[in-house]
Amino acid sequence: MERVADGVWLLRGDLRKSMNVYFLEDGDGVVQFDAGSRAMVKSARAAAQELGGVKRVVLSHAHADHRGTAPSMGVPVFCHPDEVADAESDASIAPYMELSELPFAPVRWIYPFLLRRWDGGAVKIDGTVSEGEEIAGFQVLHFPGHAPGLIGLWRQSDRLAIVSDVVYLVDSTRLKPLPAGEASVPHPAWAWDHAKAKQSVHRLAALEPAVVCAGHERPLRGENLRETLERAADKF
């Protein structure tokens, strides 16, 4: 676990430590944002305990690699209203995903296995969060596209964006990280609405963040993040 900003800790785990779970300081405990993969349950529990205990889990969206620890944390779980049905489903592959669109056959074949491996199963959703609400000092922003109810968190004071899969810092078509300093819009194979996914990346770019914490790999930092994100929106 590493501290990535004031009151924000990142736990990386599973496949080449590319799955990210964030803990946000909230009074005498923490809020967990995103839930990584099922293999991270033990480390997520330990991290939460070290930080004073987790109060609730907030899912950025309901994909298998972002809900994995949620059923096992023993606290209320929240998500955007448009993600509730998928979060409470036992399906590891969202109904709108088109894995046949991935360009390389070996990757197309392995993803169904990986998604089942990462998934912690159906999640009981205890409440919802929407655009404009506040979580641990962050503003909730709705970034639809990759998933219908994908949300990110924005803190104006240090221009910190925690955005899960609004942008990818990995090449999901090859299962490897992108070169340092690069980002992309998620591949259309994963998207509920790819055009909206690109619009969401443009919206993120317009915020002019100083740091972007995504759902996979290390935070993206630099002086020209707006330009990086604008290029990312047109990657696919």
Each predicted region: which residue ranges?
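Residue-level marker for buried hydrophobic side chains located in beta-strands
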Residues: V31-F33, V58, V77, L160-I162, ...
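Metallo-beta-lactamase
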Residues: S37-R38, Q139-H142, P148-E223
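Active-site HxH/HxHxD metal-binding segment of metal-dependent hydrolases
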Residues: A39-G127
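Alpha-helix-centered segments that form part of catalytic cores
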Residues: R108-A136, A191-R203
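Glycine-rich phosphate-binding loop signature in dinucleotide/nucleotide-binding domains
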Residues: Q49-G53, E133-A136, Q156, L207
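Conserved beta-strand hairpin/beta-sheet module of binuclear metal-dependent hydrolase folds
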Residues: M1-A47, L153-L169
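Soluble, non-transmembrane catalytic domains of enzymes that act on hydrophobic metabolites at membranes
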Residues: G52-R56, A64-G68, S72, E131, ...
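Binuclear metal-ion centers of metallo-dependent hydrolases, dominated by the metallo-beta-lactamase
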Residues: E217-F236
